[in-house]
């Protein structure tokens, strides 16, 4: 197939704790030399597009903010469309306000230690961190049980650091959905909107793109659902046991390609 562009997950594919994975910079240079468009789709909510691009560039990968699509950007688009002028309570680890222009954040976890805030119109859940404490999550659960819409920037249950795996928003969200009997809306991966938005930004059709990720479900298979060609890398959160269990199911969708790391991508693409 013609290569219209390549969509990369970031954490665990290009970097781990913002330290470059061996061969990542060389792969991006090869794609640039071959004039193959690139986009970067991440559920990272601790940093803005500008900060992410700066960190990748400092790690030897020339990336511009316009090439980065974050879960916060997608969430802001969703809220503006679905809940215009909503008063939003935000729980997130990191300041991402620059990626959410026009969103009315009436309260956030800066209110910890004070009384319970007024009931918001919408609750926004970003990435997990110290802000996900007992009191704050109790507020969110109370509002969720009352029927206040909860919009999660993603459903990721973990991410990879140089010190090992860390739990993420999805761990908490699953529990609150179970006990409240209500479902949150998740906007980031594996929802299709981010994959489609990334293709649209490059001006190509999804079936002309490759998606490269370390998460079998949230990255690779989710991209394949919208027509992209999936490439699973054996770095980051990849676990061989997970792939083996998946491969044993004859009815399950399988990744189109599996490679050791992003360093092997040029060879796979015939570059």
Task: Indicate residue ranges for each PLM-predicted region.
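Asp-based, Mg2+/Mn2+-dependent phosphohydrolase catalytic module
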Residues: 2-10, 15-19, 26-36, 45-69, ...
């Amino acid at each position: 197939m013609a290569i219209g562009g390549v969509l990369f997950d970031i954490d665990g594919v290009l970097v781990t704790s913002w330290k470059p994975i061996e061969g990542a910079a060389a792969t991006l240079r090869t794609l640039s030399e071959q004039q193959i468009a690139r986009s970067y789709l991440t559920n990272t909510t601790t940093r803005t597009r500008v900060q992410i691009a700066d960190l990748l560039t400092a790690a030897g990968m020339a990336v511009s903010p316009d090439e980065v699509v974050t879960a916060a950007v997608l969430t802001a688009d969703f809220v503006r469309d679905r809940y215009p002028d909503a008063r939003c309570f935000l729980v997130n680890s990191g300041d991402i306000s620059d990626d959410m222009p026009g969103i009315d954040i009436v309260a956030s976890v800066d209110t910890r230690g004070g009384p319970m805030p007024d009931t918001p119109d919408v609750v926004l859940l970003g990435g997990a961190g110290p802000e996900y404490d007992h009191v704050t999550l109790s507020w969110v659960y109370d509002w969720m049980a009352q029927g206040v819409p909860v919009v999660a920037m993603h459903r990721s249950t973990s991410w990879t650091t140089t010190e090992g795996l860390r739990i993420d928003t999805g761990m908490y969200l699953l529990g609150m959905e179970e006990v409240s009997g209500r479902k949150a809306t998740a906007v980031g991966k594996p929802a299709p909107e981010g994959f489609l938005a990334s293709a649209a930004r490059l001006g190509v059709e999804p079936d002309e793109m490759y998606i490269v990720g370390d998460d079998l479900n949230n990255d690779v298979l989710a991209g394949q659902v919208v027509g992209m060609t999936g490439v699973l890398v054996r770095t980051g959160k990849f676990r061989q046991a997970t792939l083996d269990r998946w491969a044993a199911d004859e009815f399950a969708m399988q990744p189109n390609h599996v490679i050791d790391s992003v360093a092997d991508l040029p060879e796979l693409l015939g570059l």
